[in-house]
Design a protein with these regions (language model features):
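Conserved SGNH/GDSL esterase-like catalytic core that processes O-acyl groups on lipids
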Residues: 7-9, 21-116, 161
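Alpha-helical cap/lid subdomain in secreted, periplasmic
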Residues: 78-215
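Residue-level signal for beta-strand positions within conserved beta-sheet cores that form or flank
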Residues: 4, 55, 130
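Extracellular cell-wall/glycan-interacting regions and their flexible linkers
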Residues: 1-5, 215
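Short hydrophobic segments within beta-strands
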Residues: 11-12, 137
Length: 215
């Protein structure tokens, strides 16, 4: 019997990294930090939990810590080089999960420019993988929970709305699915207001699955 599992790729920032599964040099989560983050294995990540729930298999994860969608930062997700790496081993994804943009907010990227680059990213994804389903996640932030860190990045929360509106508009224009996490107005357990801990990863996965259109 043919394998009917969906091949799923992920495009994102530090929230979607894990050592050995995402590009080296841009990793935030990994087993050596599990005692701090509560994220010990890739099975603890939001994206692997979503992939399992969709009865899928990971093809590629091109997520980089500190990366942006727009050209305001380094390694923008709209760049062709990152989009090319959503394929692997001669195979292309059936489904792509995108959760990116918090670093654009943190770096005060101009929302209109962010929206234009998000649209450009989706256009390039369509050109590279015309048969792929794509789900775009809106942005939310976390609350501090069981963390040794005192530095909180939750100030980003107050500036999310225009970026989320840009993501919604870009997904609608491209005809792609939206995981509108922001509309829930709920937060996840985090270490610093942005990076989920183990419990926060479970919450993020639930939020994603609860809000994704037409799964």
């Amino acid at each position: 019997m043919a394998n009917t599992q969906k091949l799923i790729s992920v495009l994102g920032d530090s929230i979607s990294t894990f050592d050995g599964y995402t590009p080296p040099g841009g990793v935030y989560y990994g087993p050596s930090f599990g005692s701090i983050t509560g994220v010990y294995t890739p099975e603890d990540t939001w994206w692997m939990q979503v992939i399992r729930a969709l009865d899928g298999a990971l093809l590629a994860n091109n997520s980089w810590s500190g990366s942006t969608v727009s050209m305001v930062g380094s390694l923008p997700a709209c760049s062709p080089s990152r989009i090319r790496k959503l394929a692997a081993e001669g195979m292309t994804p059936d489904h792509i999960l995108i959760l990116a943009g918090l670093n654009d907010v943190n770096m005060y990227a101009e929302p209109q420019a962010f929206g234009a680059d998000y649209q450009r990213m989706l256009q390039r994804i369509r050109e590279a993988y015309p048969q792929a389903d794509v789900t775009c996640g809106t942005l939310t932030t976390g609350y501090l929970s069981n963390t040794p860190f005192t530095h909180q990045l939750g100030h980003v929360r107050d500036r999310l709305d225009p970026y989320n509106q840009a993501i919604r508009a870009a997904a609608a224009a491209a005809g792609y699915r939206l995981a509108d996490i922001a509309r829930l107005d709920r937060r996840y357990a985090s270490m610093d207001g942005l990076h989920p801990n183990g419990e926060g990863m479970k919450q993020m996965a639930r939020f994603w699955l609860e809000t994704t259109e037409d799964l």
